[in-house]
């Protein structure tokens, strides 16, 4: 489960870099949305891993 948290965290960082660096105005909104979604998924995966829930 911690593996998923790390993957989601890395994806959120990549999406944040693209969304907040001003690469393209058209993709910035999508990247910001992905940043929020994957950041939430990373937090949930970390909490599930800490709590010992392996059935997500």
UniProtKB/Swiss-Prot annotation:
Residues making up the signal peptide according to the UniProt record: none
Main location: membrane
Transmembrane segments: 5-25, 33-53
Name this polypeptide is given: UPF0391 membrane protein GOX0352
One Pfam family this sequence matches: DUF1328
Source species of the chain: Gluconobacter oxydans (strain 621H) (Gluconobacter suboxydans)
Superkingdom of source: Bacteria
Protein family membership: Belongs to the UPF0391 family.
Membrane topology: Multi-pass membrane protein
Keywords: Cell membrane, Membrane, Transmembrane, Transmembrane helix
Subcellular compartments: Cell membrane
